[in-house]
């Protein structure tokens, strides 16, 4: 929705900002056209109330998880592969991504979105759930998707919620 063929060659951060400002000219959008690193992520995230991660690679998911834990920020992680996706929300004191997947996989062993493809509507489903989680966190209404992983399968139109208790031996959040 944010990016069209007319945006080919443009930085995603610019095309997304431009479209969002056209939707609501009263919003303030801070953009960062740089690589997210273990050094820059905590500095950027500390300025925000809630972080939404929706990248297409595990390296970034672990980086966002680790940086948010380091600065005590709540966040939503979302991922898509082929016809489905998954999402979870973390607030301090609840399970983090490393509670479920303690060790980051070797990128060469995991197919990426470019090689296996994604169903655009599945992206919309997971993105809408992440947007809902963000609104629920900010407004304090409803029950967040903490200590759980929501798995959506668009090929069967099923949703499963997997219990994700905080791991007392988590290498990252068990100390927080």
Residue ranges of model-derived segments:
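Adenine nucleotide-associated cytosolic modules
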Residues: 1-176
């Amino acid at each position: 929705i944010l990016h069209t063929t007319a945006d080919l060659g443009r930085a995603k951060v610019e095309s997304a900002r431009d479209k969002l400002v056209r939707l609501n000219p009263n919003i303030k959008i801070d953009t960062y056209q740089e690589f997210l690193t273990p050094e820059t992520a905590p500095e950027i995230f500390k300025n925000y109330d809630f972080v939404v991660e929706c990248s297409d690679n595990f390296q970034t998911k672990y980086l966002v998880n680790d940086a948010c834990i380091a600065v005590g920020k709540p966040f939503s992680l979302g991922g898509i592969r082929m016809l489905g996706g998954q999402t979870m929300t973390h607030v301090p004191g609840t399970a983090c991504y490393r509670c479920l997947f303690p060790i980051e996989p070797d990128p060469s062993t995991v197919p990426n979105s470019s090689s296996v493809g994604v169903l655009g509507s599945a992206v919309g489903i997971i993105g809408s759930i992440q947007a809902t989680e963000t609104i629920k966190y900010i407004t304090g209404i409803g029950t967040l998707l903490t200590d759980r992983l929501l798995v959506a399968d668009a090929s069967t139109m099923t949703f499963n919620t997997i219990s994700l208790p905080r791991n007392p031996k988590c290498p990252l959040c068990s100390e927080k």
